[in-house]
C-alpha cells in the first residue's frame, strides 16, 4: 500500500476497523495510563487516528495524522502482521517502546494499524503501580487455565465441590444440588457433555442433573 493507493472503505472495512476500538480500551485498562494505544484507519492518513487511549503521553488526539514511522512500518508489513519492537523519541517528547500491528480486511489488504507505545521515561515505580493491588482494586477472582475443554470442566467441578463442602451452611443432603447450582451459575453447562461429566463425578444420574437445572431455571424466572 502506498500514499497513492487509496480506495474507499466498504462497510465491512469500517466494521473491522471499529471493532478494534474495544482492543484500544482493553489494552489501556490492562497496562495503564503510561501505555498509549492508537488506532489508525488508512482510509484517510491525513487524519488517520480514529481512537486513542492515553494520548497525553505524546499529546496526540483523535484526528491526528499517521506518523512517518508508521508509514515506513506499513511498507515493511505486506507479508508480516506485527512489527518488531522499536524505540522512538520525537523532538521534545518521551522515549517510547512500540509495536505496530497491521489490521487486514477479508482480502488481506491492510486497512488500519494498531500502535502500542509504552512510555519509558516514566519512573519504574509509577509504571509498576498500575499492576499492584490497592484498597480500591476489585477482589481477585480465581481462574482455571486448562489445556482442553474436558480439563476445564473437570477442574471447575473439583473446585466447586471443594467450595460447597467447605460451606457449613449447606446440608449434606443438598450438596449435590448446590454444586449443580454453582456450576450452572458459572456457565459450565454451556459446554458440550458437561452434564455427563458432572453426573459421573457426583455419582448421580443425568436425569437428576437435568432436574436440578430445570428447578434452578424455574426459581430464577
Swiss-Prot record:
Signal peptide: none
Top-rank lineage group of the source organism: Bacteria
GO cellular component, one term: cytosol
Coiled-coil residue windows: none
Family of the protein in this entry: To E.coli YheO.
Record-given protein name: Uncharacterized protein HI_0575
Source organism of the structure: Haemophilus influenzae (strain ATCC 51907 / DSM 11121 / KW20 / Rd)
Amino acid at each position: 500500500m502506498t500514499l497513492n493507493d487509496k480506495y474507499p472503505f466498504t462497510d465491512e472495512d469500517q466494521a473491522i476497523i471499529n471493532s478494534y476500538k474495544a482492543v484500544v480500551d482493553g489494552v489501556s485498562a490492562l497496562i495503564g495510563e503510561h501505555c498509549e494505544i492508537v488506532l489508525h484507519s488508512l482510509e484517510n492518513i491525513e487524519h488517520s487516528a480514529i481512537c486513542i487511549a492515553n494520548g497525553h503521553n505524546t499529546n496526540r488526539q483523535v484526528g491526528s495524522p499517521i506518523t512517518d514511522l508508521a508509514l515506513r512500518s506499513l511498507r515493511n508489513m505486506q507479508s508480516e502482521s506485527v512489527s518488531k519492537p522499536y524505540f522512538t523519541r520525537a523532538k521534545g517528547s518521551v522515549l517510547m517502546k512500540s509495536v505496530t500491528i497491521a489490521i487486514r480486511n477479508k482480502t488481506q489488504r491492510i486497512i488500519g494499524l494498531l500502535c502500542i507505545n509504552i512510555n519509558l521515561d516514566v519512573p519504574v515505580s509509577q509504571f509498576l503501580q498500575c499492576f499492584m493491588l490497592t484498597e480500591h482494586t476489585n477482589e481477585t477472582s480465581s481462574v482455571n487455565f486448562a489445556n482442553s475443554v474436558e480439563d476445564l470442566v473437570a477442574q471447575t467441578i473439583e473446585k466447586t465441590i471443594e467450595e460447597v463442602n467447605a460451606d457449613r451452611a449447606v446440608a449434606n443432603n443438598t450438596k449435590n444440588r448446590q454444586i449443580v447450582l454453582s456450576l450452572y451459575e458459572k456457565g459450565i453447562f454451556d459446554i458440550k457433555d458437561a452434564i455427563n461429566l458432572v453426573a459421573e463425578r457426583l455419582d448421580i444420574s443425568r436425569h437428576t442433573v437435568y432436574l436440578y437445572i430445570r428447578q434452578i431455571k424455574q426459581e430464577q424466572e
